[in-house]
Each structure stands twice: as C-alpha cells, then as structure tokens.
C-alpha cells in the first residue's frame, strides 16, 4: 500500500552558523514552536543512465523522522512535488516491487542501484497562526551527501539549507504568496531561494550521468529545429497520457491516439532526419504499433459515446431501452479490452525503446544533413514520397470489390478504407509539422479533407460491424432487433454519404 500527497515547499540557502530570520508576522504566522533535532539517513536510487534524475523524479529509502519508508517524488516545479510513500522494508539493498512498478516508465524498465547517500541533521520549527494551528513547517537541515559511483570523491559534500513546507490542503497560490513574503525575511539575514532546490541534485554534482548530457539545439530555420521542438511536446504529452492510462483513466484516450499517430508520422515521414540504425528502426516500428493499438481504443471509445443513439431525434425514439443497454454493454466491453491492449503495449519493451529514441532525439539531437535543410526543401522530398503512396491506397479504397459474398466485400471495404484512412491521417500530420508554408497549400488542404471524411467512413463501417454482431446475439436470445435495424440504417446512410465525399476528396489528391 502507498499514499500520495502534494508537497509545496521552498528551499533557502543559509550560511552554516547563520541565524534564522524572525518569521512572526509573515503570512498569518504569529508564533513559532521549536523542536529537538533528529537524524535522517536516506539512500537515493537511479538507473545506470540516471533516467530518474532526467525525468525530475527521485526515489529514496529513508530512516529516521516521522515518515520513514520508501519515497517517490515527482517534481512539477522547483516548489511543487507529488510525493508517494511506501512502507519501510527491512531489506535495504532491494527496491520493493511496488516501487519499481510505480517507476516503470521513468526508469525505462531498467534496474535501480544506489547513487547517493544523504544524511541530515534536521531541526524543525512549527509555524503557527493565532489559533495555534500550523501554517507551515520550517526544517533547518545540515546535510552530508556522499556519491556512491566509482568516480565519487572521498569527502562528502556538506551544506546547510532551510525548507519551508506548507501544511496539506493549502492552495498553491496561497502557498506561493507565503513564500514571496518569506523571501524578504530570509533576504534580511543574507539568505535566498536555493540555486538548486533538490538535495539529490546537489549530492550528484559531478556524477557521470548519461541522461543529463545534452547536445545543442539545431540551428533556427532548419527542419531539424522544428522536429526537435515538436517531438519534445509530443514526448511530454505521451508521458502524461500513458500515466493516466496506466491508472485506469481513459479520458485522454483519443488524445493519446492523436499523439501516438503524430509520433509515428514524424518517425516515418521524416526518417532521413534521423541517423540510420537498428535501434531507431525498432523505435519507428514501436511508434507504428502504439499508433495502431491506441487508434483501435479511440475508435472503441467513440462507439461507446455514439453508437447507442441515432443521429436524429425521430430515429432515436424508435430505439428501445433494452437495445440501447445491450449496445452500450457491448461497446464498453470492446472499449475496455482495447484499453487493456494499450496498457499491455505500454508495459512492453518496444514502448521503452520508443521512449529511449524520443529521449535521444529531444535531449541529444544529431540531425543529418538532410534535416539541416530548410523546411521547404525537405517538404519537397516528403511530398514526393507521401503523395503517390496515398494515391495508391485511395485507388484501392474506392475501387469496385469483386468478392463473392457480401461479408467478404464488407470486410475488404473496411480493410482498404482503413488503410487509406491511416495513410491520409499520417500524411496530414506529417505535413502539419512543417505547415502549409512548406507544403503546397492545395495539397495540404486536400489531404486534410480526405482524412476527415475517411474518419467518418471508418467510424460508420465499424459501427455497422458492431451493430451486426450485437444484433445477432440479441436475436439468438429471442430479443427484438428492430432498434438495431434503425441504428444500422442510420449508419449505412452515414457510410454512403462519407463514401461519396471520400471519393470526391481523394480523387483530387
């Protein structure tokens, strides 16, 4: 079991032997209560590459004080952290399984080992209001940090710092107003906000940390500069979305599908921008796999929202409650299975390889000569690849099918339409990265229109397939199927309309 809370604090640098400022009268603080000093002993862990530090995450095993145990801290800013506590274990040499599981993505699936031992002599002062209720806690820390790597200096680093942490439940804005008021009092005694707010970061100073080694940004005006900037945003979005999906929150499902597809589009459409190698090839395949599995889940989520109801009120009144409930149950089951498939993918080695590739592309870009050209020149090459590929799939999607049975024709129609849809969606996202300033505006617009109408057609075809399956189950159970027919007719109309629009749009690509 673990518990999580929000930690809002500010750290100040104070000279050793210097006096603490008088804080009475600041932000509702009317009296203070000093406590006896106590000792803290913490060992911090990370991967060989220091992936956790790079992700602004710390994990430690700490003894002493009121909250001994294993702690995970995720920094939102220099003052705001999300802290997760796990019970203290007797085995100080092994990270508990539940801690490793909580850090799976940040550690990129790699093992952890001790990197720093930090011992602290802490003296706490409770900061109280007029009623004696605690406003914040001041911790005056004398810190000793010893790196544990092979190149560590023999002498520990020593410094003094003061942490002021607000009590649980205080609004972040109120907390920062308090800190702003405290800054003046600390300045009066020659202290100020710490240049480095993390004990771990200070303790690791000089450590050989591969993930902390970065390269210069590509020059402005180059395609490489645009790609690095875009991939940085996509990586941030992906990590946020995958964390929510792991926790069972599906609210970002469609956004996750869009993010995954754009990453796949960049790694595929701009492949010459990245150095050749098996690792990047595997990462590109992983991006394709993630895009595919999240697209299925997003489509399943769409069916949950839209399939139980017709597009017009008049038609909707013809659908009985039992039909609606069965459809809703079936679509939710399909959605839940699709989400499980996504979570399984997020726990796999290909996803970790994709994250490693994104880390390198963003933190240590090594652009090729092709990528160092202007966006307009690169767009010419990309357009020459994208346009014929889309056209080929378009012809297959709008061609007459000669399959013997209706079921075979429908399956073939769905497959070719999906292929054209995926190609046009990728093409649009590929072009969106550089924009219509680089690509011909007419082509950019036509690809976008084709992607929109194909999205509607794919949704309609999948809706028909789901309705057919659910109606067959209902019929075998002796239930009426009139409502399914109403909804199916509605979807057939949408499919036919979107088909005509798709043919018109795609023939212009």
Model-assigned labels for residue ranges:
Residues 1-509:
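Function-determining surface determinants
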């Amino acid at each position: 079991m673990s518990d999580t809370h929000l930690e809002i604090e500010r750290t100040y640098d104070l000279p050793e032997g210097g006096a603490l400022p008088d804080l009475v009268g600041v932000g509702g603080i009317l009296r203070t209560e000093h406590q006896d000093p106590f000792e803290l002993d913490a060992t911090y862990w990370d991967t060989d590459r220091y992936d956790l530090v790079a992700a602004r995450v710390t994990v430690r095993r700490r003894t002493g004080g009121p909250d001994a145990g294993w702690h995970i801290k995720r920094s939102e800013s220099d003052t705001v952290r999300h802290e997760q506590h796990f019970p203290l274990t007797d085995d100080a040499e092994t990270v508990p399984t539940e801690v490793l599981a909580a850090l799976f993505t940040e550690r990129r699936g790699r093992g952890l080992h001790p990197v720093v031992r930090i011992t602290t002599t802490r003296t706490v002062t409770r900061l109280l209001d007029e009623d004696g209720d605690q406003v914040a806690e001041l911790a005056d820390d004398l810190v000793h940090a010893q790196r544990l790597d092979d190149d560590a200096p023999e002498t520990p680093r020593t410094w003094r710092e003061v942490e002021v942490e607000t009590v649980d439940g205080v609004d972040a804005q109120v907390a920062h107003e308090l800190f702003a008021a405290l800054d003046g009092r600390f300045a009066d005694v020659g202290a100020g906000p710490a240049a480095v707010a993390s004990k771990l970061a200070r303790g690791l100073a000089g450590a050989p940390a591969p993930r902390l080694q970065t390269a210069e940004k590509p020059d402005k005006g180059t395609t490489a500069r645009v790609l690095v900037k875009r991939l940085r945003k996509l990586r941030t979005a992906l990590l946020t979305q995958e964390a929510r999906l792991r926790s069972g929150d599906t609210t970002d499902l469609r956004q996750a599908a869009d993010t995954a597809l754009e990453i796949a589009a960049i790694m595929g459409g701009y492949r010459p921008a990245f150095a050749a190698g098996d690792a990047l090839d595997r990462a590109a395949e992983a991006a394709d796999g993630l895009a595919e599995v999240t697209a299925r889940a997003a489509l399943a989520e769409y069916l949950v929202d839209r399939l139980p109801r017709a597009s017009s009120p008049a038609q909707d009144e013809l659908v009985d409650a039992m039909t609606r409930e069965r459809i809703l149950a079936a679509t939710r089951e399909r959605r839940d299975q699709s989400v499980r498939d996504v979570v399984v993918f997020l726990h796999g080695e290909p996803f970790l390889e994709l994250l490693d590739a994104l880390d390198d592309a963003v933190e240590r870009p090594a652009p090729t000569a092709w990528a160092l050209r202007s966006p307009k020149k690169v767009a010419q090459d990309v357009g020459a690849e994208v346009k014929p590929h889309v056209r080929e799939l378009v012809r297959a999607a709008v061609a007459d099918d000669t399959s013997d049975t209706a079921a075979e024709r429908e399956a073939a129609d769905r497959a070719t339409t999906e292929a054209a849809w995926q190609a046009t969606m990728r093409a649009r996202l590929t072009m969106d990265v550089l924009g219509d300033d680089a690509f011909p505006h007419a082509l950019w617009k036509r690809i976008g229109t084709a992607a929109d109408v194909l999205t509607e057609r794919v949704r309609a075809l999948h809706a028909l397939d789901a309705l057919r399956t659910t109606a067959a189950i209902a019929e075998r159970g002796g239930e009426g199927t009139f409502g399914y027919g109403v909804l199916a007719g509605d979807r057939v109309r949408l499919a036919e309309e979107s088909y005509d629009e798709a043919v018109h749009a795609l023939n212009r690509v």
